[in-house]
Design a protein with these regions (language model features):
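Substrate/ligand-engaging "lid" and interaction regions
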Residues: 2-430, 436
Length: 436
């Protein structure tokens, strides 16, 4: 069967210009999902195209994703990113992935040993909020989580990300190897501290001495990530196949815009990501708050209210003048005043966000963005509401967004149609009154 690795691709497709034989698994990444493929891996690929090097990525998935990993191996770990702009598309073949491991295809033991190889300098993660096994109420490791319970009972055969990281660091310490940097790339507030709390919490339960070594020698930089990457669909994969002339089951579509802000704190080196436009900074927090409240907050606002209004995609919402005006007003009148970022034109930033949301080439489903709202709204909306309450200033659109979420998670829309709610906290038992 032909793959992108076995055929001559059209000239308009950008392929790797570097020697992939030089790559090593310097980065091990948890979570080979759509966002990582279109963001961190792509930016690492840009660095390699600019100056070569050996900064390859080993992709890790634990108890799912075996089919995707098999498909990736069948095409020599290459995959396609299709950047879709209002004025045209660009197909890019990403070659930064060096190898991949999956617990079903390989073994859990092989995965843990991969983290212990001497050349590994960075372990990065895109595992969503749930993957860190943190109690959202306390910010500490959730010791009632079934995977954490398992890992504390059988620490040498861990099933959670914190358990695997601690076991790998323990083995590296015992073998006299340098530690690695743990780099969370998830779209959650203060992600560096989240993963640090998870790892140190697990280590403390196993060995206070080990926890002390990790605290002294391992770094957990914060990051801010930004790119709109809809989930792959049969339609998007068929469109990419037309561009390539061959099928790529690992391909993903996204918008042209990309941003990555990274705290420059690495204990064992890193790629020269700044060559690819990454902003290496001392403090990520102001950037993170700007993005979470202005972009993600308005995204959630549009997702819940748009879905309830019958809009399938964010771009559909933006064709409605009322939704477009409400989203921009939310950004500038209610979210921007809560921020402390300097030297950024927030009006210009809001206008760029509106243009990105309106991109007709992206089919970003309101239903997809509406997932896991109980874990997303605290940082996207409630943080801003808390500030407004202290100042006694207006937050009526934020209130409307939260009300939209409440209606959505009830599981039934105003027409009586069932909603497929995907949220760790289920409110489908609630019956909300229909307003007539």
């Amino acid at each position: 069967m032909n793959t992108i690795a076995s055929v001559t691709l059209p000239h308009h497709v950008h392929a790797p210009r570097y020697d992939r034989q030089q790559l090593q698994s310097r980065i091990v990444h948890f979570g080979f999902g759509a966002f990582h493929r279109a963001h961190q891996a792509l930016l690492t690929d840009r660095v390699l195209n600019a100056q070569g090097g050996d900064w390859g990525i080993c992709e890790i998935s634990l108890f799912s994703g075996d089919q995707l990993m098999s498909q990736l191996r069948a095409q020599n770990h290459l995959y396609t990113v299709l950047e879709k702009g209002a004025d045209g598309n660009q197909a890019i073949i990403v070659g930064a992935v060096h190898e991949c491991l999956n617990a079903k295809l390989d073994s859990l033991a092989a995965i843990i040993e991969k983290f212990c190889e001497p050349q590994v300098a960075i372990v990065s993660l895109t595992i969503t909020e749930k993957g860190y096994c943190i109690d959202p109420a306390t910010g500490a490791l959730d010791t009632s989580n079934p995977r954490i319970i398992h890992d504390l009972q059988t620490p040498e055969e861990p099933h959670s990300a914190p358990g695997i990281l601690v076991e790998a660091l323990k083995r590296r310490r015992e073998r006299g190897l340098t530690p690695f940097t743990v780099l969370s790339c998830d779209n959650i507030p203060d992600n560096g501290h989240v993963v640090k709390n998870a790892v140190l919490g697990m280590a403390e339960k196993r060995s206070p001495e080990l926890a002390g070594w990790i605290k002294e020698h391992v770094s957990f930089p914060g990051t801010m990530v930004d790119r709109i990457v809809p989930a792959a669909t049969d339609e998007s994969l068929a469109e990419i196949s037309q561009h390539l002339g061959v099928n790529d089951p690992c391909a993903i579509s996204c918008e042209p815009f990309i941003q990555w802000v990274v705290e420059d704190n690495f204990v064992a080196g890193r790629p020269a990501w700044e060559v690819a436009g990454v902003q290496m900074v001392n403090d990520v927090l102001p950037w993170e708050e700007m993005k979470l409240r202005m972009l993600n907050g308005s995204h959630s606002f549009l997702a819940y209210l748009g879905y309830l209004s019958g809009f399938a995609h964010i771009s559909d919402c933006m064709q409605d003048r009322a939704f477009r005006h409400a989203a921009r007003t939310l950004m500038l009148n209610e979210q921007a005043p809560t921020l402390q970022i300097k030297d950024v034109d927030l009006t210009q930033y809001a206008d760029k966000l509106i243009a990105r949301f309106a991109n007709p080439a992206l089919k970003h489903k309101t239903w997809q963005i509406a997932m896991d709202g109980s874990q997303k709204l605290p940082q996207r909306m409630l943080a801003g509401i808390r500030i407004h309450l202290g100042r006694e200033t207006d937050w009526s659109l934020l209130a409307l967004g939260v009300a939209g979420w409440m209606r959505y998670v009830s599981g039934v829309d105003d027409a009586g149609n069932a909603i497929d709610v995907r949220d760790p906290v289920s409110y489908t038992h609630l019956t909300l009154p229909t307003i007539r």
